[in-house]
Amino acid sequence: SEVTAVSVLTRPALKKKSAIPHRIFANLALLDGKYLASAPRHVLANTTMDAFAHLAESYINTKATPYSRMCVAAGLREWARSKDVVLGKREATAEACVTMLRAACFGGMSIAQTGTSLPHGLSYAVTVHTRMAHGKACGFFLRNYLAEADPVDRDAVLSLAGFADVDDFEAYYRATCGRDAVPDAVLALAVQDLMTNPAKMALAPFAVDETVLRRIAGIGEAG
């Protein structure tokens, strides 16, 4: 997302992907809808799913504040406006492209305050070992992350994004990104990697242990 001070470095030789925060912050974010005008629908699906993950993980976060949640709420309202474009139900007009970028911008403003949480932390191993696109990999874990959250927080996120419940979100994820099968061995590796990062685990506002992480990862679930 725009307006964050974080870069992500992938090192294939080491099978590692991690975030690198810098003590810099952009003065300007260029939100020009023309950047998205020729993007294939699968690219829009994956990148807008990443933006949703930023927003949801910032809201359901131990570092969330009334101010960060104001950014999340604004971003989710913008994000919801472009769902039909990603679903292929209407064209990606210039206005729709700007709306998608604006949602991404609010996502960046949100995680700049809170950081991302467990879905992002679990996604890195999946991206490295299966080459799944980043946004799609984050979305892979979102349904179960939302299911673990406090019902009030979960319902706030889903309602703002225009979803009735976690299954409604999951149906959208499958329709746009598709749910690929990920080997349990890779998911178990994602869990073990995340357990070495207590700072990331601490950002989930509920008790987290290996059992919870395996549940969020969906280990043992049929596709």
Label for each model-derived stretch:
Residues G108-A133:
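Glycine-rich phosphate/pyrophosphate-binding beta-alpha loops
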Residues R23, L158, G162-G223:
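C-terminal charged capping/lid subdomain of soluble metabolic enzymes
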Residues S1-V3, P119:
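Short glycine/serine/threonine-rich phosphate/pyrophosphate-binding segments
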Residues A125-A181:
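Active-site pocket-lining segment
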Residues M70-A74, E95, T99-R102, G121-Y124, ...:
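Amphipathic alpha-helical interaction segments
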Residues V6-T114:
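Carboxylate- and glycine-rich phosphate/diphosphate-binding segment that chelates Mg2+/Mn2+
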Residues E2, A53, R77, L101, ...:
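Glycine-rich flexible loops
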